[in-house]
Curated annotation (Swiss-Prot):
PROSITE patterns: ATPASE_A (PS00449). The keyword Cell inner membrane applies. F-type ATPases have 2 components, CF(1) - the catalytic core - and CF(0) - the membrane proton channel. CF(1) has five subunits: alpha(3), beta(3), gamma(1), delta(1), epsilon(1). CF(0) has three main subunits: a(1), b(2) and c(9-12). The alpha and beta chains form an alternating ring which encloses part of the gamma chain. CF(1) is attached to CF(0) by a central stalk formed by the gamma and epsilon chains, while a peripheral stalk is formed by the delta and b chains. This is ATP synthase subunit a. The chain crosses the membrane at residues 25-45, 82-102, 111-131, 142-162, 181-201, 202-222. Belongs to the ATPase A chain family. CDD domains: ATP-synt_Fo_a_6. NCBIfam families: ATP_synt_6_or_A (TIGR01131). One of its GO terms (biological process) is proton motive force-driven plasma membrane ATP synthesis. It comes from the Bacteria. It holds the Pfam family ATP-synt_A. It comes from Geotalea daltonii (strain DSM 22248 / JCM 15807 / FRC-32).
Length: 229
């Protein structure tokens, strides 16, 4: 879906000479739009914090507190250092998903490059954390408990870890791109009443996909913190 907004035209003009497609340029434009939106909301929510919170502060405290509780419940207290990363990914993916429900807008998570970037961030963080936590012993995560099976287990584990990137990428991309295509079809057939149930379902899908990505990211990072056997 192509949306000829002025800021999209600017990004296309800027990025297409670099060999980036119009779809990729649009995804980058919406990504920066969402980053700016999240920054503005964060500044407004944290400006003049009060012991008795206002509506904006209370709303943000509920969201951030909910994510923090989920991180602690899933990863334990030692998961708190990863809360900023998990919360950032969750909020970015959620807003990216929801923005596609606004007529004329396109979710950057419906572009495979965006979802791949998020997946790579989780993948790299997982192994940096594992190496930092265990040092050379981190390789035990890839060798398994039986010594003579270690070469085969290493090969299988490496494939498994790389498949995480693929699964995180394709799950989010497939669901959001598929939903966008369905919305386009329904808007074309009946542009008023029929798409409304699909848009409501889109809200549910947006929350579920953000939650699944966040949950898997926590599980993967938690796994790298555990002792290898």
């Amino acid at each position: 879906m192509v949306h000829p907004f002025l800021f999209l035209q600017f990004f296309r003009h800027l990025l297409t000479p670099l060999g980036i497609s119009e779809g990729g340029a649009d995804a980058i434009a919406y990504t920066w739009l969402i980053i700016a939106l999240l920054l503005i909301v964060s500044i407004l929510a944290t400006k003049g914090l009060k012991s008795v919170p206002g509506k904006m502060q209370n709303f943000m405290e509920v969201i951030i507190g909910g994510i923090e509780n989920m991180v602690v419940e899933t990863m334990g207290e030692h998961g708190k250092p990863f809360f900023p990363l998990i919360a950032t990914l969750a909020l970015f993916i959620l807003v990216s998903n929801l923005i596609g429900l606004i007529p004329g807008f396109f979710p950057p998570t419906a572009n495979i490059n965006t979802t791949a970037a998020c997946a790579v961030i989780v993948f790299v963080t997982t192994h940096i954390v594992g190496i930092k936590e265990h040092g050379v012993k981190y390789i035990k995560h890839f060798l398994g408990p039986i010594l003579w099976l270690a070469p085969m287990m290493f090969f299988i584990e490496v494939i498994g870890h790389f498949s995480r990137v693929i699964s995180l990428t394709l799950r989010l991309f497939g669901n959001m791109n598929g939903h966008e295509l369905v919305l386009m079809i329904f808007f074309g057939l009946a542009p008023f009443l029929v798409p409304l149930p699909m848009m409501l379902m889109g809200v549910l899908v947006s929350f579920i996909q953000a939650f699944v990505f966040m949950l898997l990211a926590m599980i993967y990072i938690q796994g790298s913190l555990e002792e290898g056997h």
